[in-house]
């Protein structure tokens, strides 16, 4: 089997990709059997290519699946954790802008009753 190109795989349907994946897996199994039974050197070098092809297929399948999920959850309020933006732990725990702007009743009364002082500089 020749090396698969991710560019050509991206346009294909999910079931076609799954079929190709199954073919690659069966080919890998036959190559491994031939390795144990003492197959030709050309078949042994093919194992690496087939393994990489399987990895490429799985990568394309997973990426398209995640892309579809991102489209689905785009207009939802809550998203699954793996689809959210990756932030640092500290940023995730930080107060939101709304939480920062909240004031207690006592603070609101103080700001209402006491005007902001204006200072003039004597020249």
Curated annotation (Swiss-Prot):
Membrane-spanning parts: none
Which N-terminal stretch is annotated as signal sequence? none
Record's Gene3D superfamilies? 1.10.287.310, 6.10.250.3450
Alphabetical list of CDD domains matching this protein: Ribosomal_L29_HIP
**Record's superkingdom?**
Eukaryota
List the HAMAP family: Ribosomal_uL29 (MF_00374)
Output this protein's name: Large ribosomal subunit protein uL29
Q: Which organism is it from?
A: Caenorhabditis elegans
From the broadest rank down, the organism's phylogenetic lineage runs: Eukaryota, Metazoa, Ecdysozoa, Nematoda, Chromadorea
Protein encoded by which gene: rpl-35
